[in-house]
């Protein structure tokens, strides 16, 4: 049937900030949905609090609301925009939960649900209702019981044997779930799960540890046409969250009979749940001992796995699901890649591997064992002709300096057994190492329960290593076999060097391959195993078993101008969706100029790897071997390395030397900006202040240099992103401890030492330069003091406390740096304002993580403007082309946007709830996974919105617990006064309480944990504390501080860990009390105001 005509205006709900369990896969689905609905002529209204998304660009919707995703916001938008229907299935768990909250409020009126109706959502999401539905259609389920309090939960212990699986309902990424083995663990996890479930419901079921896990991506339409888009198999057995498991598509160890049973079961489940206009993900488990198959759960929406399945097959799941939601049937929808009907089930003739990316190194003390609660922050995908090739390419894609199955260290056999038995991010590497140590497939299966087929494949890779020595350089057949098995040039060189004590590089292997014509072949992802011609080139490389003909390896369309954009690889802390946003904008800008675009990336979650973002997509590891192969094939007229973060930037010099034309800022300039010594000399010549700094190549030299500079100092290794291993140290003892624990210092890896400007205000500046003119796009003032990583700091645009004269001075210094450095394109500079003196902290001649925020706040798409400048070289013309809202002031020497009549605030979002044992304290090492944006008429309201959107739900009244480190106690009176003025009662332990009382305010004294009961921990658990202000000395995560912060996370209590944000919070609470922050206004309205 054709599209629905009874609806005109559709509200699309986004997923909010990037968090563990919900990443940028929902920007991919949301962007596809918005584009599809607009093309069909619907009026699209969109809500999402995340500015770093493509879907929140003003052109993708008729009205874009960058607002907290709450029931109140949505009801206000529905009323204001006269919404006819809501599409909640493209924004993950966040969108489903809020949609159900709105539905249950009874205030929706005639507004319809698209994609999945409320009844279907309840059936799919409420574990008890889902269980009843499965029983009705004869599906097998784990033995289980539901509970709504601890007493009810205890009944399960009498009926189901340990170990027990506990799952919280309506949570994200397995939050509140886990396996318990005894009563102590049962009590702790049960109480946590009940607290985390928004409906205080938990499921207690028999453990399925060691069972095989599978997923089916299913689509169903109103006419009951059903297709399986993709089957996915988890290499890790049940017990590891599917988001943290290594997965394979298609499923490889199912028999045909098992597959057909699972396929039919999936269709029956969608029919019973009532999903008839979209896609769903259904998860199964199979007992390897007897073949018993049970249903685990289903998601009645587009999911993380949907994004993977879409990229694995080339089937546009989000677009098809959107079309189904508005009335089309599968046979009426055309597959954009092949032009065939969408009712054809995809067929693939290759193997896809997904490996999750973790960043445990950012969270000392966090539990790194993998379980049923998700912990990964990103993922990579690789495509190969065989499992061996695919898995080795995936390992190379992780950006962990892996060359494949690298050797890993272990203490002894018992340690190796422990590391294999307990799932962790390196488990497959330990499995490979165990084969090298003589373990059998049977022994390893008993330890890890990974299917013997996968273990055998890994063993064959390890066994083949024995054949790789210097003879491979002259043995064409052996070298070809190594390459068809996925061995990288780098790994082959390492193995030869290990055997024969040589010093071969990957280049040496490359030249041998070229001489022997062992060259990468590029194949298409086309959903049909080559049966139909692909209209959209989406490519991966493999080494064929026989020699290639030259025509098979050459790219077509050589006459067209084309530019290759290198993406950022897997999401991780320090390099996230913001960089993919810039890459996508680069592609759009090149298309605007008629340039053919080539996107190169390995992240399946992103918009950049969507089939219609660029003209050609290469899904390959971002390493030199694979980059070189694509550049040799395509021979692009330019390569952009500046938008994908540090990942592509580190290849600038090698690619330039190889002959690739880097457009924009040159490799020489990039290298100079990274060289601290050269760059310090450059800044000194310009007469710009910078903190005293030095480098050290040994511990003793570091101690000497730090003493000369004067404590406190900021220390870090060179060449880092996201402030990794960066720390403020206050004395020699702390410095020696840091040098011992955090870095490996040497002549090749010096440590950088900078004067730390205590209590300074940090400033972020984004600018664009064409060599003649400079556009200072945004001057952002950080809310938190200097010393907290810029990626973790909230910031305001325009600045709140920096006068116009100082802003002009900052703009001038930015222009001086950009013009003298030779920047062509984007530039980010971090300044610090200390005692009214401006200091330059850092310069990055590339896209920064604030580019999306500044673009949204000002209405100028900075990455698009910069791309145009990099290709055509004229900044003013590029600005005029994209200045839709007429915000640029062209009358000044240094170009700047006009001061807006509103305030924008960016706030960071953190993963502490998912990483038990980690501290909330912020510092120079970045720890946030995502961001939100608040826009309103003033700072107080904007900051209030940013706190609501980042899940720090500030109370309007109640008790504030204040605990300040000694250094901060002088500000006690100021903090106390602000919160007393708002009507809050104060509570504190000894020292801080005394300070508050002496300041003239009432304060309830509460015991420290070591002083008796009731103490502060009891008060937190009992819900007697409604807001916590807790500052502590760096790295003092112990005692009371540790217990306080663990309970803050467990009971979701709002908190501040530094004074400036606590003071900003007081202003926000005033706005919340007055309800002024609840006003909603679209981004388009703000930009036109």
UniProtKB/Swiss-Prot annotation:
Binding site for Mg(2+) 4: 842, 844
EC number: 6.3.4.16, 6.3.5.5
GO molecular function: ATP binding; carbamoyl-phosphate synthase (ammonia) activity; carbamoyl-phosphate synthase (glutamine-hydrolyzing) activity; metal ion binding
Residues noted as binding Mg(2+) 3 in the record, renumbered to the chain: 830, 842
GO biological process: 'de novo' UMP biosynthetic process; glutamine metabolic process; L-arginine biosynthetic process
Cofactor: how bound: Binds 4 Mg(2+) or Mn(2+) ions per subunit.
UniProt: Mn(2+) 1 binding residues: 283, 297
Region (Oligomerization domain): 400-553
PROSITE patterns: ATP_GRASP, CPSASE_1, CPSASE_2, MGS
Keywords from the named record: Amino-acid biosynthesis, Arginine biosynthesis, ATP-binding, Ligase, Magnesium, Manganese, Metal-binding, Nucleotide-binding, Pyrimidine biosynthesis, Repeat
Catalytic activity: hydrogencarbonate + L-glutamine + 2 ATP + H2O = carbamoyl phosphate + L-glutamate + 2 ADP + phosphate + 2 H(+)
Cofactor: Mg(2+); Mn(2+)
Enzyme class, UniProt record, top EC level: ligase
Binding-site residues, Mg(2+) 2: 297, 299
Chain ranges of the ATP-grasp domain: 131-326, 680-871
This protein's pathway: Amino-acid biosynthesis; L-arginine biosynthesis; carbamoyl phosphate from bicarbonate: step 1/1; Pyrimidine metabolism; UMP biosynthesis via de novo pathway; (S)-dihydroorotate from bicarbonate: step 1/3
Keyword tRNA-binding included in the entry's annotation: no
GO cellular component, one term: cytoplasm
Subunit structure: Composed of two chains; the small (or glutamine) chain promotes the hydrolysis of glutamine to ammonia, which is used by the large (or ammonia) chain to synthesize carbamoyl phosphate. Tetramer of heterodimers (alpha,beta)4.
Its biological purpose: Large subunit of the glutamine-dependent carbamoyl phosphate synthetase (CPSase). CPSase catalyzes the formation of carbamoyl phosphate from the ammonia moiety of glutamine, carbonate, and phosphate donated by ATP, constituting the first step of 2 biosynthetic pathways, one leading to arginine and/or urea and the other to pyrimidine nucleotides.
Protein's name according to its UniProt entry: Carbamoyl phosphate synthase large chain
This protein's encoding gene: carB
């Amino acid at each position: 049937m054709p599209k629905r005509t009874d609806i005109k205006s559709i509200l699309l709900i986004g997923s909010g900030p990037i968090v563990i369990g919900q990443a940028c896969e929902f920007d991919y689905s949301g962007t596809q949905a918005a584009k599809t609905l607009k093309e069909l002529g619907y009026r699209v209204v969109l809500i999402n609090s995340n500015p770093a998304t493509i879907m929140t660009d003003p052109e993708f919707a008729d009205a874009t609301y960058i607002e907290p995703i709450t029931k109140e916001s949505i009801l206000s938008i529905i009323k204001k925009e006269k919404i006819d229907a809501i599409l909640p299935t493209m924004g993950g768990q966040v969108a489903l939960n809020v949609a159900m909250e709105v539905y249950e409020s009874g205030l929706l009126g005639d507004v319809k649900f698209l994609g999945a109706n409320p009844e279907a959502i309840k059936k799919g999401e409420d574990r008890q209702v889902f269980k009843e539905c499965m029983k009705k259609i004869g599906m097998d389920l784990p033995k289980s019981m539901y509970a709504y309090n601890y007493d009810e939960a205890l009944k399960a212990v009498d009926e189901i044997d340990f170990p027990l699986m506990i799952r919280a309902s309506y949570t994200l990424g397995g939050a509140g779930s886990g396996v318990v083995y005894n009563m102590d663990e049962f009590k702790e996890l049960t109480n946590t799960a009940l607290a985390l479930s928004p409906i205080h419901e938990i499921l207690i079921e028999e453990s399925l540890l060691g069972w095989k896990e599978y997923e089916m991506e299913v689509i169903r339409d109103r006419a009951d046409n059903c297709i399986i888009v993709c089957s996915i198999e988890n290499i890790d057995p049940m017990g590891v969250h599917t988001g943290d498991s290594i997965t394979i598509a298609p499923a490889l160890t199912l028999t045909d009979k098992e597959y057909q049973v699972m396929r039919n079961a999936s269709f029956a489940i969608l029919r019973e749940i009532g999903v008839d206009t979209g896609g769903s993900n259904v998860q199964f488990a199979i007992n390897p001992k007897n073949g018993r198959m049970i249903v685990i759960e289903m998601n009645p929406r587009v999911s993380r796995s949907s994004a993977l399945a879409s990229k694995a097959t080339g089937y546009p799941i989000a677009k098809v699901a959107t079309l189904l939601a508005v009335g089309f049937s599968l046979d009426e929808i055309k597959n954009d890649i092949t032009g065939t009907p969408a009712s054809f089930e995809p067929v693939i003739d290759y193997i896809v591997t997904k490996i999750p990316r973790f960043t445990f190194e950012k969270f000392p003390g966090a539990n790194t064992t993998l379980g049923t609660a998700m912990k990964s922050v990103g993922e990579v995908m690789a495509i190969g002709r065989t499992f061996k090739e695919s898995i080795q390419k995936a390992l190379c894609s992780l950006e962990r300096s892996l060359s494949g199955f690298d050797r890993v260290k272990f203490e002894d056999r018992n340690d190796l057994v422990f590391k294999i038995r307990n799932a962790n991010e390196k488990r497959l590497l330990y499995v490979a190492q165990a084969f090298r140590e003589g373990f059998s497939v049977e022994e390893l299966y008993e330890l890890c329960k990974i299917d013997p087929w996968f273990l055998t494949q890994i063993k064959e890779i390890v066994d083949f290593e024995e054949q790789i020595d210097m003879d491979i350089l002259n043995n064409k057949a052996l070298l070809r076999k190594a390459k068809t098995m996925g061995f990288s040039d780098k790994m082959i060189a390492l193995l030869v060097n290990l055997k024969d004590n040589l010093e071969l590089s990957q280049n040496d292997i490359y030249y041998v391959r070229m001489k022997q014509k062992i060259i990468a072949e590029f194949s298409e992802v086309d959903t049909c195993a080559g049966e139909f011609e692909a209209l959209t080139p989406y490519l991966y490389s493999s080494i064929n078993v026989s020699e290639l003909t030259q025509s098979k390896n050459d790219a077509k369309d050589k006459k067209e101008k084309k530019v290759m954009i290198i993406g950022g690889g897997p999401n991780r802390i320090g390099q996230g969706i913001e960089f993919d946003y810039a890459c996508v904008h680069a592609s759009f800008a090149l298309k605007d100029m008629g340039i053919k675009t080539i996107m190169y990336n390995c992240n399946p979650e992103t918009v950049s790897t969507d089939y219609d973002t660029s003209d050609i997509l290469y899904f390959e590891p971002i390493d030199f071997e694979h980059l070189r192969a694509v550049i040799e094939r395509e021979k692009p007229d330019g390569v952009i390395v500046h938008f994908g973060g540090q990942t592509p930037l580190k290849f600038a010099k090698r690619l330039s030397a190889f002959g690739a034309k880097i457009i924009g800022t040159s490799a020489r300039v990039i290298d100079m900006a990274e060289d601290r010594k050269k760059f310090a000399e450059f800044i000194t010549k310009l007469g710009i202040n910078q903190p005293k700094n030095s480098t050290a190549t040994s511990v003793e030299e570091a101690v000497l240099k730090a003493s000369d500079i004067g404590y406190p100092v900021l220390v870090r290794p060179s060449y880092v992103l996201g402030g990794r291993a960066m720390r403020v140290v206050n004395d020699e003892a702390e410095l020696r401890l840091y040098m011992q624990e955090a870095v490996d210092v040497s002549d090749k890896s010096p440590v950088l030492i900078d004067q730390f400007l205590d209590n300074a205000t940090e400033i972020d500046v984004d600018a664009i330069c064409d060599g003649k003119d400079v556009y200072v796009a945004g001057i952002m003032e950080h809310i938190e003091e200097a010393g907290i990583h810029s990626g973790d700091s909230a910031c305001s645009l325009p600045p709140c406390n920096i006068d116009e004269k100082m802003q002009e001075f900052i703009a001038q210094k930015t222009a001086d740096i950009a013009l003298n450095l030779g920047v062509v394109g984007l530039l980010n500079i971090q300044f610090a304002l200390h005692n009214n003196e401006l200091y330059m902290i850092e310069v990055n001649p590339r896209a920064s993580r604030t580019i999306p925020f500044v673009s949204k706040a000002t209405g100028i798409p900075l990455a698009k403007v910069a791309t145009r400048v990099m290709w055509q070289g004229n900044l003013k013309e590029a600005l005029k082309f994209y200045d839709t809202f007429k915000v640029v002031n062209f009358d000044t020497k240094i170009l700047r946007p006009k001061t807006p009549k509103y305030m924008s605030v960016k706030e960071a979002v953190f993963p502490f709830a998912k990483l038990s044992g980690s501290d909330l304290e912020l510092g120079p090492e970045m720890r946030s996974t995502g961001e939100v944006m608040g826009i309103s008429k003033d700072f107080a309201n904007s900051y209030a919105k940013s706190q609501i959107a980042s899940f720090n739900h500030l109370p309007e009244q109640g008790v504030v617990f204040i605990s300040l480190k000694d250094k901060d106690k002088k500000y006690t009176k100021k903090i106390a006064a602000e919160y007393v003025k708002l009507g809050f009662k104060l509570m504190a332990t000894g020292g801080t309480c005394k300070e508050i009382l002496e300041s003239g305010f009432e304060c309830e004294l509460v015991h420290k944990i070591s002083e008796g009961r009731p103490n502060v921990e009891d008060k937190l658990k009992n819900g007697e504390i409604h807001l916590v202000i807790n500052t502590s000395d760096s790295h003092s995560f112990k005692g009371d501080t540790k217990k306080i912060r663990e309970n803050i996370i467990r009971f979701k209590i709002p908190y501040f860990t530094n004074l400036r944000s606590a003071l900003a919070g007081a202003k926000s609470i005033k706005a919340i009390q007055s309800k002024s922050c609840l006003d909603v206004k679209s981004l388009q309205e703000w930009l036109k105001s």
